[in-house]
Every structure is written in C-alpha cells, then in structure tokens.
Swiss-Prot record:
Residues binding substrate: 69, 120, 165, 172, 196, 248, 266
E.C. numbers: 3.5.1.2
Protein name according to UniProt: Glutaminase
Superkingdom of origin organism: Bacteria
The protein's assembly and partners: Homotetramer.
Record bears the keyword Hydrolase: yes
HAMAP family hit by this protein: Glutaminase
Swiss-Prot/TrEMBL catalytic activity: L-glutamine + H2O = L-glutamate + NH4(+)
Gene Ontology biological process: glutamate biosynthetic process; glutamine catabolic process
Organism: Bacteroides fragilis (strain YCH46)
Family statement drawn from the similarity comment of this UniProt entry: Belongs to the glutaminase family.
Keyword presence, Phosphoprotein: no
Length: 321
C-alpha cells in the first residue's frame, strides 16, 4: 500500500496540532527536581524533521530544556556504535521491565542484566560502557559529540539542572551500586552515575530532537548535516528499543494509540521516530502521573492520526512537495 503526503499537509497538521493542544491545562511540572518545577508551564513547541533536512516548526520549538531520559536513546546509539548490537544485548539487554523507569526491584528480579539502556539502570550501565574506560573527560566528550552528531548542533549543559539532579539522585546512587554488586556496571559506579546525571542535564530544543529522530528514521544519516552518524543496520535495533520501552510501563498503550515509537523525558520532551518518513519532537513541561508530557503526547498523536500514519500499517509513505 502506497501513501503520498505533501509537505503542505504536514505543515497544516502540525499547526492544527499546536492550536488544538496549546490550551490544555492537564498535568504538572516535575516537582522532585527544583529546576524543572520552576520552568514556565505554558511553554509548548513542536518540530518535525523530514528526511530532506527540512524542519517544520511551531511554538517554542527553539527553547532549550533538559533532555533528561530522552538522552538514553542517544547513549544507547553510542554504545551500539562502539560495541555492536549483540554485545549490547549481552551486557545490558533490550527487554522492557514492566516497572517504573527508576525501579530498583527490576534489578533484584532480573539481576543477570539491567534489561535495557532505556531505563535508569541500563542507562547508567550504558554510560559505564562508553569508551575509553576509566577516563571521565574523554567519555563525556564522546557522549556530547554523539548527541551533537545526532542533533546536528551542540547541546549545552544546564548547570542549575545538573546541580539539582546531583543533589537529589539518591535512588540512582542505589541503582549504580546495586549494579556493581551484580557485576553489571563496567566502570567506576560514581563516575558512571555522574556521566548519566550530566547527560540528562544537557539543554536541547524540540527542533534538535526532531533532527536526532530524523537521523534514526533516515538510517543513521543526519538529514540536516548529511553526516553518516551510525550504520543503517542499527536503525531497527534502536527503533525496537524505543517502541518497547520508550514510555516505560505504558509503552504498549502509547504504541496502540499513537502508532509511532517515541521516547519521553521528565523535562517535557518527547521524541518520535517513523522510519523512512520523519522524526518528530514536542515539548511542554506539565507531565502526567507517569512523568510524560501531556501536551507533547497529544500533539504527536494528533499529527500521526490526522496524517493517517502508523508504523504498523505496512504503508510505503512518500512525502512530496
């Protein structure tokens, strides 16, 4: 089944999504991290990155917010590049836990591996795997360069957010040392946790995340810079991880209602990948009870449903002028 969509259609639907959703008052800012609690709750932006490099934007698409857990996708890509898909499967895994993203119980139940790079335990383990082992500065450079390559522009560390995160990350400290107990962290636990905390504190925009999603959708080639960031054979690995655990224990509901693999973060960002078609991101700080942006979810669902797109419907989608 073939489906053609014009760029003007996408522009119209993105604008409609913004107008439909911007007045929604549901959810509240994350209050357990002081920096996030104080961000303007009315901020809202959407960006779609087409595979020709064109971005379609509306609202606060260029506001820098904390990337938070969306960064897990980026570092998963980095270790897939450095180690290969099979080694990552063996050292971390790719399975959903069915439990909250910061669960310690998940480690106790399945201590043979941290289960997936897209939950906290697996993400801390992923940071420990980044090479060169034992060199915090060079590991950090690799993490930032990878995000820059994916987004097409450099993220900026939000120092206030980093300090807030570091002062309140008691649960993650427990996770790091529990991983050490089970030999599932591959560098110094404190270093690995600090790298994870710092990467979550990087400031990005909805437009940047849409380009990163577009890079995944485009087989590893950044649509804007045209740089081959990773091998195309990794796209299905990355997309499957996002589909199964991008919304944590609610990933099934998300996939059923939206039809697009997407990753969420408590900073208010959501990044979605439609392979071969486009990358999309939306940002708004108020979150639902599971830590997912209310407006971003509604906006992306609106775009997908209005355009009649779904990763599972088997359609070959062509975007035309």
């Amino acid at each position: 089944m073939d489906k053609k969509i014009s760029i003007s259609q996408i522009k119209e639907v993105v604008q409609q999504a913004y107008e439909q959703v911007k007045g929604n008052t549901g959810g509240k800012n994350a209050d357990y991290i002081p920096y996030l609690a104080n961000i303007d709750k009315n901020l809202f932006g959407i960006s779609v990155c087409l595979l020709n490099g064109q971005t379609i934007t509306v609202g606060d698409f260029d506001y820098r917010f904390g990337i938070e857990s969306v960064s897990k996708v980026h570092t998963a890509i980095l270790i897939l590049r450095q180690y290969g898909a099979q080694k990552v499967l063996e050292m971390i895994g790719a399975d959903a836990t069915g439990l909250p993203f910061n669960s310690i119980i998940a480690i106790l139940l399945e201590n043979d591996h941290p289960s997936t790079p897209l939950v906290n335990a697996g993400a801390i383990s992923a940071c420990s795997m980044v090479t060169p082992i034992g060199n915090s500065d060079k590991k950090w450079d690799a993490i930032v360069q990878n995000i820059t390559d994916l987004c097409g522009s450099a993220p900026q560390l939000i120092e206030e957010l980093y300090k807030s995160e570091t002062a309140t990350n008691f649960n993650n400290r427990s996770i790091a040392w529990l991983l050490k107990n089970y030999n599932r962290i591959y560098d110094d636990p404190n270093m690995s946790l600090d790298l994870y905390t710092r990467q979550c504190s990087l400031g990005v925009t909805a437009q940047m995340l849409s380009v990163a999603a577009g890079t995944v959708a485009n087989g590893g080639v950044n649509p804007v810079t045209k740089k081959q960031v990773f091998d195309s054979e990794l796209t299905p690995k990355i997309t499957s991880m996002i589909a199964t655990v991008g919304f944590y224990e609610h990933s099934g509901d998300w996939m059923y209602t939206s039809g697009i693999p997407a990753k969420t973060g408590v900073g208010g960002g959501v990044m979605g990948v439609l392979p071969g078609v486009f990358g999309v991101s939306a940002f708004a700080p108020p979150l639902d009870g599971s830590g997912n942006s209310v407006k971003a979810q509604l906006a992306i669902k609106y775009i997908m449903n209005k355009l009649g797109l779904n990763v599972f419907n088997g359609a070959r989608v062509t975007i035309v002028d």
